[in-house]
Swiss-Prot record:
It is a multi-pass membrane protein. Disruption phenotype: Small plants with reduced chlorophyll content. Susceptiblility to the oomycete pathogen P.brassicae despite recognition and rapid induction of hypersensitive response (HR) but associated with a reduced oxidative burst (e.g. H(2)O(2)), a runaway cell-death response, and specific deficiencies in the expression of established markers of immune and stress hormone signaling (e.g. PR1, PDF1.2, AIG1, EDS1 and PAD4). The lineage of its organism: Eukaryota, Viridiplantae, Streptophyta, Embryophyta, Tracheophyta. GO terms for cellular component: chloroplast; membrane. This is Protein RESISTANCE TO PHYTOPHTHORA 1, chloroplastic.
Length: 197
């Protein structure tokens, strides 16, 4: 039996999976991925800007959303998200997300289960934002700007966690960089620093 992955031309978000046995007919399946099992919703049309940076921003947003929709945890059924704002489940996910960020900091700074050697606890602390905080916050039914910020973070944090140790081997520094990236992305996407008049 042989398996091969090949991309199809003309279909942007699908993969053709081909398998076959010797001396038998080959079959091809197309697999389509969406963020939550539903067809993707179109964003409201934005005013066209002549600059190339807006086109680049749109393309980047599209790639990030597609990648996060493919690899980030999501609902397995096509049901409405029960973690709506104001519900207990929404609060549970929110508290879980920020508590795991805090606990990750405590672990990566070697305050809980201290050791003089690198160990699993410090490693878990370093990766806590990517493993627990971002998925917990993405599980809520949050506004589209916040979901977009979390999609970007889902891709940026692993890059930071892998790249920083090449230059400075510190669990605390990696966790700190992840935290700065987290709040900087929220500030950028949610407009925390914009002036209101």
């Amino acid at each position: 039996m042989s398996w091969s992955l090949c991309s199809t031309h003309g279909v942007s978000s699908s993969i053709a999976l081909t398998y076959g046995f010797r001396h038998r007919r080959r079959s091809t399946f197309r697999i389509f991925a969406t963020s939550d099992g539903l067809e993707p919703k179109d964003d409201p049309p934005e005013s066209p800007l002549p600059s190339s940076s807006s086109a680049l921003g749109k393309d980047l947003k599209k790639v990030v959303n597609k990648t996060a929709a493919t690899f980030a945890p999501r609902a397995s059924t096509a049901s409405k998200n029960p973690a709506l704002p104001g519900t207990t489940l929404y609060k549970v996910f929110e508290v879980q997300g920020y508590a795991s960020m805090f606990l990750g900091g405590v672990l990566s700074f070697n305050l809980l289960f201290p050791s003089s050697e690198p160990d699993l606890w410090r490693l878990m602390g370093m990766w806590s934002i990517w493993m627990f905080t971002i998925p917990s916050l993405r599980a809520r039914d949050c506004p589209s700007k916040e979901k977009e910020a979390l999609n970007y973070l889902f891709l940026i944090v692993p890059l930071l966690n892998v790249a920083i140790p090449f230059f400075w081997k510190s669990f605390a520094l990696v966790w700190s960089a992840d935290t700065v990236a987290f709040f900087a992305m929220y500030a950028w996407k949610l407009g925390w620093l914009e002036r209101t008049e």
